[in-house]
Amino acid sequence: PLHSQVHARLRGADFHDAYEADDALPQASAMDSWLAVVGRTPGWVDRAMDLRNAIVARIGLKDLGRLKPAQGGDRAYAVGDRVGIFSLQHLSEDEVVMTDADRHLDVWVSLLKLRAERKIVVSTVVHVHNALGRLYMLPVAPVHRLIVPAMLATS
């Protein structure tokens, strides 16, 4: 969405998408909505992350763990904190923006609450830096297009 914090990162992006869903928690903050979405990550997504981590460890990429944060949802988050596999970059009542960056690629994820429409939008923007990042995105991009809608369908 135009008013999302990640919109400015679209220029030059190698991958981007956005998925909209009904807001199951219309009174909640963006962070609480994000925690609810990742808290109900389907088991097959967890298994896919485990497989991803096992494979990429062999080629020198980092093990991200799973999407769901280890801490409970009652924790007060601040910019700079880790939230699951991401670092928190922006936090407001209506939007949470997180990133994971390394020398191969930068990933930006946003959950934006469209309160008037009672919707949430999860957006992803990826900037690839080198050949290993491009190689990594070959299988990840199509799987990502399955994972986010599946997570939103369970929230």
Question: In which residue ranges do the predicted regions lie?
Answer:
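Hydrophobic ligand-binding cavity/cleft-lining segments
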Residues: 1-68
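Beta-strand residues in well-ordered beta-sheet regions across diverse protein folds
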Residues: 22, 99, 121-123
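Secreted/surface-exposed cysteine- and glycine-rich disulfide frameworks
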Residues: 67-72, 80
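Short acidic, glycine/tyrosine-flanked loop/strand segments centered on an H-E-D-like triad
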Residues: 112-131
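A short acidic/glycine-rich loop-to-helix N-cap element
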Residues: 126-147
